[in-house]
């Protein structure tokens, strides 16, 4: 301190805050001026002063010191709003999943960064001496990021693999985390724990490998005599001065440096601070320096090529173990910096664009000449400013000036009004984040079930020519058409046909697969035949056992056009039989005076197509006999003879026959309305037994009475029956009968209440309780019914020319469904009388079965359907051409083995109510899709819940626009007859005339011509897209008549907007919220199937946006299930920028693993490089120079990659250390197989300098390949087998060395340590006795020639600097090959 006191009058007092960086510079100046000893004495005094001040200040930290930033609330709301809009765009198909992920991450990262930037001004304004604020900028272990997590928001987290979790933690640690945020926080914080434990060991292992590969590198000579060097230049300001200084200080010049004609530095002069400053000042020529790359030695290094020692400002001493120092210098920062993640808690620290926000409300103004319009990387319109742009925001009382840096995006227009804190500009990230990105694959999974379609061309990837992998050539949408898929390898392919109607929610198809998909159709056929034909066809046969086959339940209505016994009527080989009846199915037109509505008649046929005697063929429920309320039935007990005697009854599974108890034919019969409730035993009843209640009285907690009257409660079998009798209660003196019906005009004439009755009455005698003797009489109104003969089902089935035999008879029977004399019915909808059509044939025939099937005939586009019934002598007489399953192998658990077909509700109706009926949400249509596997078949069930209807459009004024747009091309094929439901079967999947229908001569016109079809179709203006992709226009093509079974194809859709005159074609896909009418946008996305003039219906579809190069999985029209892989994107993804991700990159570079994907246009770059080399150097030099430049370029590129990782973390490592490592992994070449076989064995690894010397000695061309060895392989390919054996694979290395007879000259450190010898470094280093001046003259002459050759090489390599600066930068990924940057 005496020196300081003496010099105080001449020194200036600086009142300035010193941070860590300034302290480093101060210590460096102390060492330069006063030396190390005196500097340590000064720093001890500074340390003591710091502890004394900290004790006096006594800074503490409490929870009240954590001040939350006020602007956080609306910043988070703004980010949530942006995320919501982004989610909407993704749902509409405007943004694909990768864009959504990337933009979401950028939104939240920008919000978190803005909060972090606002934190410091907030502390300075509100509490500048806040302990948290003081600690965060003290330079100790901790930074602003941790304080930001305490008082701002924790933000985005990184998982242990370094990938971002796109769900941000919006809370900070002061507010506390929710459960979800806590789980994500633990997941991210686990990253710090993992890094501390595992990555530390990785860094230690990296240090061991680095030391292993360079442990023998020792400074052994002063000068190796090389004239080569590497050129370094500031590149006209492209290289930062700081990096330029770090690169040059401590190096040795390889050539003289001239400014004009004056030499300012000579060869072999070391570069200090003063010389570097002169280089920067004068902007001298590119400077050639000596590096370890240019040293001529193989196993050591010279003083001048290494340069100054890092410890002191002088050339490195001889005997210095610079290799071990280099390995430690690279490995040690990795070990230390691994711990950084633990302190940041796994928070993502990436580089994205920063936002500039408006300071206040006002009008923004800027010079429009300095900007030009463009789009941001997300496609949003913006202005790009090429230089600094000053923006003024004029509010009412103040004008704010904001400076926008160059290459930024301005997101507002000139003279636009902006609100406070609105984002007005986006600043590009200052540091390039390319080194923090990697190419990854992102799989997109389907979130719905249906069929996949696309509206663009795709092509197969060449490596998957026969697979289902497709590449998209351009941006397009993938669509999932919604539906309920079902797949099975069992026999339903012969049961369910295309266009079948079924209950959409009854089959076990809904997300339930057959449990044994390995069962093939052949196994099912074998099982069915063996069980079906095993017994004799007599009464008492056992029912075939199908329990081993998997089951599928089916309830409700199913519309089966082709029963399985005939397999679509396509392959019968039976002989001609006359026991056949064919019934034409008439289409009943609306508007006729008819008693039978067409929707009430159903044909009932078993699923296997087999009918027994007295089977019900069709039935009709008369609406006049339907009651909507519960009640009692009453009729006389007089019974008629049954149609079928009980002893003649043959019971067969699933076929309904007439039981005698059904055959009560009474006329009239009566219905007594009574309200009946069946309640559970645990129900709380709120009315009493024998009480009288009014209408709408609370009975239980959730039930009310519909009528008023007497309440009777009965308990039966764990259930309570509550009956409410409406009517009058009388207490007569005596009663004769317990039950009595009084007709109109009846009653006792001597009664006081005598009155001529107009209606039927029902009198019932009742007791108040079981033990009471007194009776009372309940008088109830009665509804009488008479059965009429007006229902004539025979009119629907006329006997005509098609009937070949009188053996088969059809009888019409009316019967009452409820047979007890008094039966209580509590259903809400009761059918009292049913009319049925019974099939019968002669008793003397021994035939017990008849087979029924539907036949469809087309002539000139006209379609007609028939029901055909054949008597079958035995099942063997029916054989199939393809050995198909003659019956179904499915058992229905509810015992109902029949299809209810309603062919009379036809599409010929012009009623809109019928259209609504066909869109019943409980109905669905089966669509068959062909699988690549021929043994199985895929079905998709399309219900009306997958469709939506729009309209009617009342404001459509010109329907001719629609007509004209369709008439231009009435039959439009869509993707080569692939319809909207994929590669389905055609509407009729069998040959219509492959078998003989009848032997009688008939006139086809009698059955196939409908006179009033033209009139009907002129009323219906709609356009239909069918399975084959053809467009049917019944309005203009009246000869096309749709099959009446295709009820479900009433999916109508037309997209029409009068304002924009939008005309949408059939089959087109529409995204959500497309304008189709004046009422507003449409709500769902889907595909156009059918269109009408005034209303439209679409089939719902889910769009997915895909970019060019994306991989599509699956075929067009293929069924996809929820969770299936839909498309794969390849994109660049940001990785977190901490050292845990950088350290593996260092390891990848030094182990020479590929870390960057190969450029797409690599071939063009190589072609350009070859042309450039040939043009400048000429043909003879091309290969020789090319091999040399390849090694030089690869070395410089590796150094730059390693430095880039460390510099991104603020770690400074001298290039010398990395160069020593890289020299070792690039100093080997691989001997080619065609040359040098007489000197080296093919494929042998030899040193690069050794190969060159051998070539010069042999005076012949040397063929070798430059190879990059990783540090592990380089450690295993040294001159010392003892060093290799001590590293790894000891037994193999020693055995191989013994077989080859290798000699270890013990030149390295490790082998001497193993054998206990003196290590050749430091005090154990021996100065070389032979210097170059002792070499004889003739050898000196050879050396001189060699030097001349090297001088020529140097001229070619390093004096054509324009060539290197231009060509190398254009033809290689790394453009800084000459700068170590």
From Swiss-Prot:
Molecular functions (GO terms): DNA binding; DNA-directed RNA polymerase activity; zinc ion binding
Q: Which UniProt keywords apply?
A: Chloroplast, DNA-directed RNA polymerase, Metal-binding, Nucleotidyltransferase, Plastid, Transcription, Transferase, Zinc
- What is one term from the GO cellular component aspect held by the record? chloroplast
Q: Where in the cell is it found?
A: Plastid, Chloroplast
GO biological process per UniProt: DNA-templated transcription
User: What is this enzyme's EC?
Assistant: 2.7.7.6
The name under which this protein is listed is DNA-directed RNA polymerase subunit beta''
Its source organism is Guizotia abyssinica (Niger)
Classification from the root reads:
Eukaryota, Viridiplantae, Streptophyta, Embryophyta, Tracheophyta
């Amino acid at each position: 301190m005496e020196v300081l006191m003496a010099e105080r009058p001449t020194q200036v007092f600086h009142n300035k805050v010193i941070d860590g960086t300034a302290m480093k510079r101060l210590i460096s100046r102390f060492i330069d001026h006063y030396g190390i000893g005196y500097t340590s004495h000064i720093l001890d005094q500074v340390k003591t002063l710091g502890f004394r001040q900290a004790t006096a200040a006594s800074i503490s930290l409490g929870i009240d010191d954590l001040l939350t930033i006020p602007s956080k609330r609306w910043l988070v709301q703004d980010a949530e709003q942006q995320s919501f809009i982004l989610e909407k765009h993704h749902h509409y198909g405007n943004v694909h999943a990768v864009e959504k992920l990337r933009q979401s991450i950028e939104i939240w990262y920008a919000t978190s960064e803005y909060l972090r930037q606002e934190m410091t001004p907030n502390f300075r304004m509100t509490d500048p001496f806040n302990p948290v604020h003081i600690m965060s900028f003290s330079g100790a272990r901790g930074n602003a990021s941790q304080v930001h997590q305490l008082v701002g928001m924790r933000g985005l987290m990184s998982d242990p693999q370094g990938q971002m979790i796109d769900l941000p933690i919006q809370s900070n640690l002061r507010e506390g985390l929710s459960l979800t945020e806590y789980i994500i926080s633990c997941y991210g914080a686990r990253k710090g724990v993992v890094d501390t434990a595992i990555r530390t060991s990785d860094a230690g292992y990296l240090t061991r490998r680095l030391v292993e590969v360079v442990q023998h590198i020792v400074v052994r000579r002063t000068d190796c005599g090389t004239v080569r060097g590497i050129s370094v230049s500031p590149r006209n300001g492209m290289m930062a001065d700081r990096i330029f200084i770090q690169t040059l200080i401590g190096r040795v010049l390889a050539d003289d440096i001239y400014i004009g004609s004056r030499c300012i530095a000579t060869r072999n002069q070391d570069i200090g601070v003063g010389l570097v400053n002169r280089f920067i000042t004068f902007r001298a020529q590119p400077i050639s320096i000596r590096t370890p790359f240019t040293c001529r030695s193989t196993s050591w290094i010279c003083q001048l090529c290494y340069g100054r020692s890092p410890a002191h400002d002088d050339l490195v001493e001889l005997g210095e173990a610079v290799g071990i120092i280099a390995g430690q210098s690279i490995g040690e920062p990795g070990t230390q910096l691994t711990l950084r993640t633990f302190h940041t808690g796994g928070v993502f620290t990436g580089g994205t664009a920063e936002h500039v926000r408006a300071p206040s409300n006002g009008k923004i103004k800027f010079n429009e000449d300095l900007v030009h319009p463009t789009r941001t990387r997300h496609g949003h319109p913006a202005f790009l400013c090429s230089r600094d742009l000053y923006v003024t925001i004029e509010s009412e009382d103040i004008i704010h000036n904001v400076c926008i840096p160059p290459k930024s995006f301005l997101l507002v227009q000139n003279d636009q009004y902006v609100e406070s804190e609105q984002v007005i500009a986006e600043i590009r990230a200052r540091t390039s984040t390319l080194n923090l990105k990697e190419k990854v694959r992102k799989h997109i999974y389907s979130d719905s079930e249906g069929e996949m379609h696309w509206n663009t061309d795709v092509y197969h990837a060449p490596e998957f020519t026969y697979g289902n992998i497709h590449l998209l050539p351009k941006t397009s949408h993938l669509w999932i058409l919604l539906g309920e898929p079902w797949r099975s390898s069992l026999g339903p392919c012969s049961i369910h046909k295309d266009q079948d109607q079924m209950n959409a929610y009854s089959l076990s198809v809904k997300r339930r697969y057959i449990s044994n998909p390995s069962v093939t159709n052949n196994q099912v056929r074998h099982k069915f035949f063996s069980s079906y034909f095993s017994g004799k066809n007599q009464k008492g046969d056992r029912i075939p056992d199908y329990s081993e086959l998997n089951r599928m339940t089916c309830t409700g209505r199913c519309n089966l056009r082709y029963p399985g016994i005939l397999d679509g009527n396509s392959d019968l080989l039976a002989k001609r039989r006359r026991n056949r009846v064919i019934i034409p199915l008439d289409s009943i037109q609306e508007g006729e005076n008819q008693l039978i509505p067409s929707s009430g008649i159903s044909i009932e046929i078993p699923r296997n197509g087999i009918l027994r005697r007295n089977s019900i063929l069709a039935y009709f429920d008369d609406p006049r006999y339907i009651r909507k309320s519960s009640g009692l039935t009453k009729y006389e007990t007089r019974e008629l003879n049954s149609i079928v005697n009980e002893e003649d009854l043959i019971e067969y599974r699933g076929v309904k026959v007439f039981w005698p108890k059904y055959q009560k034919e009474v006329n009239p019969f009566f219905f007594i309305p009574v309200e009946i409730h069946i309640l559970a035993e645990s129900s709380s009843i709120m009315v009493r037994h024998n009480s009288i209640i009014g209408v709408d009285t609370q009975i239980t907690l959730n039930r009310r009475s519909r009528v008023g009257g007497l309440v009777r409660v009965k308990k039966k079998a764990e259930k309570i029956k509550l009956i409410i009798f409406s009517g009058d209660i009388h207490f007569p003196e005596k009663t004769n009968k317990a039950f009595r019906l009084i007709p109109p005009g009846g009653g006792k004439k001597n009664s006081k209440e005598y009155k001529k009755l107009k209606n039927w009455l029902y009198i019932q005698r009742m007791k108040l309780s079981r033990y009471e003797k007194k009776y009372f009489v309940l008088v109830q109104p009665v509804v009488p019914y008479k059965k009429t003969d007006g229902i004539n089902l025979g009119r629907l089935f006329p006997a005509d020319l098609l009937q070949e035999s009188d053996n088969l008879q059809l009888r019409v029977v009316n019967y009452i469904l409820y047979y007890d004399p008094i039966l209580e019915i509590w259903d809400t909808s009761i059918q009292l009388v049913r009319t049925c059509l019974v099939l019968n044939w002669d008793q003397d025939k021994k035939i017990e079965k008849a087979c029924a099937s539907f036949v469809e005939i087309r002539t000139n586009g006209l379609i007609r359907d028939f029901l055909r019934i054949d008597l079958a002598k035995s099942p063997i007489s029916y054989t199939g051409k393809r050995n198909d399953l003659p019956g179904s192998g499915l058992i229905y658990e509810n015992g109902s083995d029949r299809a209810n077909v309603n062919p009379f509700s036809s599409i010929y109706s012009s009623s809109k109510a019928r259209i609504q009926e066909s869109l019943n949400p409980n109905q669905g249509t089966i669509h068959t899709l062909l699988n690549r596997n021929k043994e199985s078949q895929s079905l998709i069930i399309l219900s009306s819940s997958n469709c939506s209807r729009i309209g009617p459009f009342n404001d459509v004024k010109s329907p001719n626009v629609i007509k004209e747009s369709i008439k231009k091309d009435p039959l439009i094929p869509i993707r080569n007859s692939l319809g909207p439901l994929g590669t389905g079967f055609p509407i009729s999947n069998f040959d219509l005339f492959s078998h003989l229908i009848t032997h009688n001569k008939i006139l086809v016109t009698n059955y196939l011509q409908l006179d009033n079809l033209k009139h009907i179709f002129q009323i219906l203006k709609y356009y239909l897209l069918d399975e084959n992709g053809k467009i049917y226009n019944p309005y203009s093509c009246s000869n096309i008549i749709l099959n009446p079974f295709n009820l479900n194809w009433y999916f109508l859709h037309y997209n029409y907007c009068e304002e924009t005159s939008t005309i949408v074609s059939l089959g087109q896909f529409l995204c959500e919220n497309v304008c189709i009418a004046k009422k507003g946008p449409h709500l769902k996305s889907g595909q156009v199937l059918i269109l009408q003039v005034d209303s439209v219906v679409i089939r719902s579809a889910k769009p997915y946006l895909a970019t060019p190069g994306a991989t599509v999985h699956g075929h067009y029209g293929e069924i996809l299930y929820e969770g299936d892989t839909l498309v794969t994107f390849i994109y660049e993804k940001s990785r977190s920028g901490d050292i845990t991700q950088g350290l593996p990159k260092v390891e990848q570079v030094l182990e020479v693993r590929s870390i960057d994907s190969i450029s797409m246009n690599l071939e063009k770059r190589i072609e350009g490089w070859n042309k450039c080399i040939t043009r400048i150097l000429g043909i003879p030099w091309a290969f020789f120079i090319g091999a040399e430049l390849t090694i030089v370029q690869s070395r410089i590129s590796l150094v730059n990659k390693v430095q880039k990782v460390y510099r991104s973390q603020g770690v400074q490592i001298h290039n010398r250390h990395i160069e020593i490592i890289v020299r070792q992994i690039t100093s080997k070449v691989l001997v080619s197989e065609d040359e040098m076989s007489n000197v080296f064995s093919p494929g042998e690894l030899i040193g690069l300098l050794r190969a060159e010397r051998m070539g010069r000695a042999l005076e012949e061309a040397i063929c070798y390949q430059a190879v990059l060895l990783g540090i592990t392989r380089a450690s295993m390919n040294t001159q010392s087998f003892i060093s290799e054996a001590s590293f790894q694979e000891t037994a193999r290395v020693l055995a191989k060395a013994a077989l080859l007879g290798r000699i270890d000259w013990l030149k390295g450190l490790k082998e001497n340590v193993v054998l206990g010898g003196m290590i050749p470094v430091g005090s154990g280093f021996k100065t070389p006795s032979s210097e170059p001046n002792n070499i004889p003259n003739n050898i000196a002459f050879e050396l001189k020639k060699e030097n001349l050759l090297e001088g020529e090489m140097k001229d070619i390599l390093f004096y054509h600097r324009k060539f290197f600066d231009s060509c190398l930068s254009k033809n290689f990924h790394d453009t800084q090959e000459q700068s170590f940057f």
